Amino acid sequence: YTDKFAMSQYSAPPMSGPLVVRTFQKSVGKSPFDVFDQFEKQCTAAASIGQVHKAQKDGKTLAVKVQYPGISNSIQSDLRMVKPVANAMFGLPEKEMKKYFQEVEDKLLEETNYTLELQRSQEISTTCTNIPDIFFPVYYPEYSSPKVLVMDWLEGDHLKEFLDKKPSQEVKNRIAQALWDFYNHQLHTALAIHADPHPGNFLLQKDGRVGVIDFGCVKVVPEDFYYHYFPLLVPEIRNNQAVVDQLLSHIEIIFPQDSPAVKVELQTAFLEMTALLSRPFETENFQFTHEFIDEIYAKGEEIYQIPEVKRPTQPRGSKHALYVNRTYFGIYSMMADLQANISTHADLWSDKLKSHWGLEKA
């Protein structure tokens, strides 16, 4: 659902060299040729809301991300066109879908605020600085602005190019472990996640290290949502009916006005899917495969055939789950592409959730 609105779907033609210079000067107040020792007017990469140029300053190679002019207005215009399609897809009035639209629109517009991205980049890189095999570019506030973001230039391959070089499984496992630890640390320690696990946002090294770039899309996870959503990944909690009733009600899967039959059907379906998704967290080590991803897809198709899911009488599910689910499905897909075998370290956070719900001795 969120991918219908994702910035990856937005394509803009590259800016010409003169337009890049004008855009930079308007935002920063100086020409890029006055700020940097060297600046390449030809972009090296086009991103969803801007393009990246290479520059030199004091012997350092820098990446300069320049935002497309008018992109915020384009996003809002595109969303207005897509809303009727989404409403028809779910068969619900727009006012009942408003909270989901607002969540997506807020996230997309946040991506156009490079000052916010710089702040979050620095916060997350500081929080995750001790995670093995993960590294980040240094950001330069003194050269940046709300429409221009400057950071160190990182070398490395995106996932497809990396896999084309036939790395060893040992190196692939090391990369996967770094990504897994990076995401779980963010979520369970910082309650904020890099919510765009697109392969293009990671630069993979032949020694197994991972460079992380692009913090435009970050989902801050409310503590209240965290303690009502993630406990469902813990079998001891999922098997406690009294707690499950509270959780499913709080995250808006089940409502008081639902009939007993609908409650049973939805709870059964949701718990079956959660049990499948939580499989990696229930063992010390887990082997990701494409067959596992196919199993998730198949279960999703099966659940979609439930009448109250296919044509709901009211919106179901917390808005906060949109980007969390999108993030973890992206991670799972990357793990499968790497055919990774990882240590899940689930005990580092599952005990905290069991304690929160009074199930320490379960």
Regions found by a protein language model. Name each.
Residues 236-241:
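Conserved phosphoryl-transfer catalytic core
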Residues 228-231:
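Short amphipathic alpha-helical recognition elements used for nucleic-acid or partner binding
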Residues 1-184, 191, 205-211, 215-223, ...:
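Broad phosphate/nucleotide-binding scaffolds in NTP-utilizing and phosphate-metabolizing enzymes
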Residues 200-204:
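Hydrophobic residue at the +6 position relative to the catalytic HRD Asp in the kinase catalytic loop
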Residues 189-199:
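Catalytic-loop of the protein kinase fold
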